Amino acid sequence: MALSLWPLLLLLLLLLLLSFAVTLAPTGPHSLDPGLSFLKSLLSTLDQAPQGSLSRSRFFTFLANISSSFEPGRMGEGPVGEPPPLQPPALRLHDFLVTLRGSPDWEPMLGLLGDMLALLGQEQTPRDFLVHQAGVLGGLVEVLLGALVPGGPPTPTRPPCTRDGPSDCVLAADWLPSLLLLLEGTRWQALVQVQPSVDPTNATGLDGREAAPHFLQGLLGLLTPTGELGSKEALWGGLLRTVGAPLYAAFQEGLLRVTHSLQDEVFSILGQPEPDTNGQCQGGNLQQLLLWGVRHNLSWDVQALGFLSGSPPPPPALLHCLSTGVPLPRASQPSAHISPRQRRAITVEALCENHLGPAPPYSISNFSIHLLCQHTKPATPQPHPSTTAICQTAVWYAVSWAPGAQGWLQACHDQFPDEFLDAICSNLSFSALSGSNRRLVKRLCAGLLPPPTSCPEGLPPVPLTPDIFWGCFLENETLWAERLCGEASLQAVPPSNQAWVQHVCQGPTPDVTASPPCHIGPCGERCPDGGSFLVMVCANDTMYEVLVPFWPWLAGQCRISRGGNDTCFLEGLLGPLLPSLPPLGPSPLCLTPGPFLLGMLSQLPRCQSSVPALAHPTRLHYLLRLLTFLLGPGAGGAEAQGMLGRALLLSSLPDNCSFWDAFRPEGRRSVLRTIGEYLEQDEEQPTPSGFEPTVNPSSGISKMELLACFSPVLWDLLQREKSVWALQILVQAYLHMPPENLQQLVLSAEREAAQGFLTLMLQGKLQGKLQVPPSEEQALGRLTALLLQRYPRLTSQLFIDLSPLIPFLAVSDLMRFPPSLLANDSVLAAIRDYSPGMRPEQKEALAKRLLAPELFGEVPAWPQELLWAVLPLLPHLPLENFLQLSPHQIQALEDSWPAAGLGPGHARHVLRSLVNQSVQDGEEQVRRLGPLACFLSPEELQSLVPLSDPTGPVERGLLECAANGTLSPEGRVAYELLGVLRSSGGAVLSPRELRVWAPLFSQLGLRFLQELSEPQLRAMLPVLQGTSVTPAQAVLLLGRLLPRHDLSLEELCSLHLLLPGLSPQTLQAIPRRVLVGACSCLAPELSRLSACQTAALLQTFRVKDGVKNMGTTGAGPAVCIPGQPIPTTWPDCLLPLLPLKLLQLDSLALLANRRRYWELPWSEQQAQFLWKKMQVPTNLTLRNLQALGTLAGGMSCEFLQQINSMVDFLEVVHMIYQLPTRVRGSLRACIWAELQRRMAMPEPEWTTVGPELNGLDSKLLLDLPIQLMDRLSNESIMLVVELVQRAPEQLLALTPLHQAALAERALQNLAPKETPVSGEVLETLGPLVGFLGTESTRQIPLQILLSHLSQLQGFCLGETFATELGWLLLQESVLGKPELWSQDEVEQAGRLVFTLSTEAISLIPREALGPETLERLLEKQQSWEQSRVGQLCREPQLAAKKAALVAGVVRPAAEDLPEPVPNCADVRGTFPAAWSATQIAEMELSDFEDCLTLFAGDPGLGPEELRAAMGKAKQLWGPPRGFRPEQILQLGRLLIGLGDRELQELILVDWGVLSTLGQIDGWSTTQLRIVVSSFLRQSGRHVSHLDFVHLTALGYTLCGLRPEELQHISSWEFSQAALFLGTLHLQCSEEQLEVLAHLLVLPGGFGPISNWGPEIFTEIGTIAAGIPDLALSALLRGQIQGVTPLAISVIPPPKFAVVFSPIQLSSLTSAQAVAVTPEQMAFLSPEQRRAVAWAQHEGKESPEQQGRSTAWGLQDWSRPSWSLVLTISFLGHLL
């Protein structure tokens, strides 16, 4: 049992004591009290018990305690200050006894004790005892707990307990509610009387009758243990274990019932704020927040909040007699002789006033008096007469609240300074004193300690010495508190000092005179009780030893905490009951239980007046507080404390008085900590195996509710506590909220609260403690903008105050500030300070504001002061305006330009004014230019400072330009640098010197690399990036650096960048175990492997028995058995690369290792294949689906269709779009078709759908079918626009028609139709601008277009927009006619010059296209094409336009002049394909070698140019038969220029060289035949023996095999190679493709086509074009949607028109339909073309007339439907 039983047993003991340990009114002159008679019979029974039946020590202890109960109390004579013996007063509970004796439970209770005595005397067996009495105990507990809950449990059906009745009984306990009301004070009559001491010689009363013996003290003494349980206690252990089970169950059930009842009752009183349908919520208060946490299972730290403080509860509010102004009833004065019926009731006041006399006439302990009198006035210990002894214990006075303590402190300081210094000043703990004594101690100690020689300037040293503390800290407390009190500093403080440092950090103690500081709250004034005294005394050996002689009761108080051997009675009692009983701690009941209990009861005074009933939570709160104090701190273990604390917290919430009396100010930090931990909880916690739930679906909703309803409360707590950690967590939670919910939250909060939270964010940012990852900076800007909306007016001063957060604002939010913002000098200063963190678009927006004529006038007139003030914005001026800066203006800022971050165009304009080539200080000029030197042309560098030293400062600076991307490695300046390196020889450079050349590594030729030593090469590897190493270089380096023997995992991982150089030889040298271990470090490079390298890597793991057969000849059959997969354990990094044939994972393996698989980036076909393998049940919950991770991306359309609830359907769709992998086209089409079908049906759930959709991702909005675009709300459209701005690659994944529709819809939302498009609208549209139509593009004013040319250069431009833009650029108000362009116009246009027609480009004057300008222009275009966005952009081929652009350089100036012969610098300044075959052939061999990499990588070279370049390569390396593998790889496409005989001479014995040729597209039919025949001949292989590695290596050259030869390929091997071959646009004939497709149908392949799922069609790619006509005609919709778009495009046009019907064509996904080529469309019938157009537009045009449904049941999307409108309105709230 995790929960201790001791609280329950304690209550039972109290009930028994209160029931029987009482003094009854005598019924006759000498009649014994019935209780006394009972005790005597008990004693006689024990005397008759056989010896040895139980533990002898236990019997003797028990007898001794019983015997002592009959002895009257004695007053011992002890030294002064020693407390008298513990003799508590007797209790007279006459009213209660009368009630109890009339109860039917009187007999069962007596029977319980009688049976216990019989058991001890062995008059009955334990079994008989348990049969009779277990029910009595259980019934008592049940009734007790039921009485605490309103209404209680249902009336028990069990019979009432009698002595000889059945054991399954229940106590009626009609007296128990009376007892509880009695304790609450509602019926308290003459409860406690403190009796005078009785003379032991006078055993009779004054009236001659025998006095009742003081047996109560003896009974209470039973609670004091005398020893540990012995080994003979098996009887007691069995008894407790048997009886304990029902008691524990009842106790646990009762506590839960109490808590649940309180929850409901408190909820009905306080209420709970909830968000409305719009997401708005009226904020709650702190009590409601705590109640919300309890209802949502938050674990509040009730100890830190103050609800388990262990301090005695204040007087209950229900006692009117404690109220101010209500006098307490006073008893008459004591009399020497008094009859029992006229006993005096000694008041607390009288007791506390008289107890300090020489002989207190009361039988009560000093400690009880100390407790009783704490509320009247502070207790001061009785000082020892000796001043010396007192000063040795001055520590007592230092912590005492007594006013006299200050006098003692001053006296001891004056008379015994040395002792005072040792006892007080050397103890750093006293720096944490509170009250008036703290300042006195500081002053006294400061006078005794010598001043320190020097105080540390930084954080205090560790450990702190007293002299440093008192001398430095107290001299400048404010300064040192700032250094100590930060969260990081507190963590660094040693644990021994953390307590007092934490106290000091809470602030200085205010000055008080004699009384301690008190808190005035709803309950009045509350003063601390100095309860920390025991902790300080018991933990300090010196203090403890000094104080115990004067106050002996401290020994008992400190016994537990000082690790005494005495065992608490409760602990001894429960020890056998529980396997691991938590320590009970220093509970008062473990220390001195009797006096303590009586002392607590004595604190409840007599009250004669009637008290009205109060609310149940208030009454229960007081009882729980009293119980918690009685049990002591930490008693019962964490679980018991938690349950009690939860009940205490709940019961205090409705009553402000109870709540704020207990709530500690430091509890605010605990609330923030608990909320922070809750918000940090991961909503997805996978379970070990199976489809167990892993996500709490309400967790996200609960967090949203918390933030929406209680953010103002949290903001208030943050303002008070300044917790940076909690602020960070809260801000992160806001950043992850859907924008609409966040907006509702901020707008519904009070204005002052929102402004205060923004101030907190500002402070956190200023202190550098509010950290936001780059991915969430835009969300932080959105939050800041929302908070800014709560300001009625945005001013320049507000901009200055919030300048640390300005970098996170969106441009549109930044533009909300007044236009005159930049006229403020302080604003400009703030921009200068925070400009490094601002985004370029922000600076561009602000820079454009500078151009307002009303601010600063025209650019040429700007003064130098203004230029300096706006320097961070100048690089972001539109280039046309920047070019207006005069040389004088530029030279005025000469020293500032290098660090300004200028772009190429701006930098060139500055250089023209700064560089003076006619002076001699060229090197000094370059040094001053700094980063601007990156933009110098080779000619300028040559004239200023010729490059010659590979380690020189200018050369190093230019290499830094290459490292940061400013200088292109393929440019002319880089070529000059490479010339310096080649001329000096790389061998002379040290490895460290060579490392700085890493940015130009890709341009180093193979010959140069062969000259470098191995240490030099290894030194460069750590600084290289993957893309900076060409495949040829990787082959060369891996062959040199890879150890041939004993390769370790560390060595292989150090070479991971060279993985693309994998060859048969290097792969054979890597042990399989090392490959497995290196999976994690090699994984990032796997995407750079060629298809053949990937296949070879996979082959390594599937060789039978791990034996490789990869000899140099490669002869012999494959070691794998055809058609039979070999069980293989694949490394995780290789699993996403596996062909379906090798993906042998069964359902059990997938489910058992789900955590291993759910995060892998599975391909579309793999996910579909594994989904089928798992046989996912149709009733799978959303939580189960989320547990599948990326495997859920393979979900089938049938599974979606079987989801009944619309809410569940939309949640699943949301989950799919949240996956890191893309939603496959067929699943996307299924989602929207299914949504259309559901909207056409009566759907009662539409009225309940709403908040569930708020969390859907904006990616879903972006992916909406074209037809739904017009129905989106404006807010939803803006969410899509924001998504596109953040991630433009997601826009480029859509079809062109989709992109255009989205752009037009966004423009419609931002600007009315036929109105000019403003600059703000253009900036808001962002990348969508490039897909506007002709009419919309012409709505852009030309001046606005001109000022946004720099932004347009970074966007993907659709064909329509690009054509229209090219026409607009030539207008007079933009750039004008091309024949009039100068260099400035070319630089302004940038890469947009390619939007001009070829004719217009050819008209640009040769003078405007100088070598430098031309190189920069082509570099910018190439950089764009190689960027991620550029690679996704479907721009038209620019070969003709590029040729027209460079015509003035590559063609002679006059027809009669010869063609210029290029050198390598000329080629780098243009591009290889710009030069003719004749010009290439006439190049110098050294120049060609330096540019060989560029020639091999240019896809624009024609056949003649390829032959010319290949001729130069043969001059360089000799005949082709001698080419090494790395040379063949470097030649690349140039190999097409080989003659037939030379091609036959190439050595093609392994897959390494073969794959190089197989990757080349563009071979002639003859060359294809030569390559494959040469390989088969040289390797000695037959076609039937080609494994999937060699089939993959053949690549494009596979089409060199004749159809009859292709038939011999192994279907098993080919079905694996199909994954790689299907990605190629194979130049095979239709007959060859049909043979290849037929191989996949054979038994070793995938079987009959009719059985193929869509994943098979996706796997085989373009090979699907060879499927026979009949088979294609019979394909179902799901199968068709599995065909890749590339496969669609390669189907021969006649075949395409024959095999696909209009219905099949209409089922194409939009991506498939867009892939249909114009040639294919030309062969289609009108109906087929309409079907393709319908699929391209996603249903906008139906293939059947008048909107009739197709065979697929699709409705006309344009027909109005209330359900459609409702759905779109919901989708408008997706975020």
UniProtKB/Swiss-Prot annotation:
InterPro entries: Stereocilin-rel (IPR026664), Stereocilin_LRR (IPR048992)
Gene expressing this chain: STRC
Disulphide bonds in the chain: none
Signal peptide: 1-22
GO biological process, one term: cell-matrix adhesion
Family classification: Belongs to the stereocilin family.
Subcellular location: Cell surface; Cell projection, Kinocilium; Cell projection, Stereocilium
Protein function: Essential to the formation of horizontal top connectors between outer hair cell stereocilia.
Protein name: Stereocilin
Disease: Deafness, autosomal recessive, 16: A form of non-syndromic sensorineural hearing loss. Sensorineural deafness results from damage to the neural receptors of the inner ear, the nerve pathways to the brain, or the area of the brain that receives sound information. Deafness-infertility syndrome: Characterized by deafness and infertility and is caused by large contiguous gene deletions at 15q15.3 that removes both STRC and CATSPER2 genes.
Pfam families in the record: Stereocilin
Main subcellular location: other
Gene Ontology cellular-component annotations: cell surface; kinocilium; stereocilium tip
Glycosylation sites: 65, 202, 297, 366, 427, 476, 540, 565, 656, 824, 916, 964, 1179, 1274
Keywords, comma-separated and alphabetical: Cell projection, Cilium, Deafness, Glycoprotein, Hearing, Non-syndromic deafness, Signal
Signal is among the record's keywords: yes
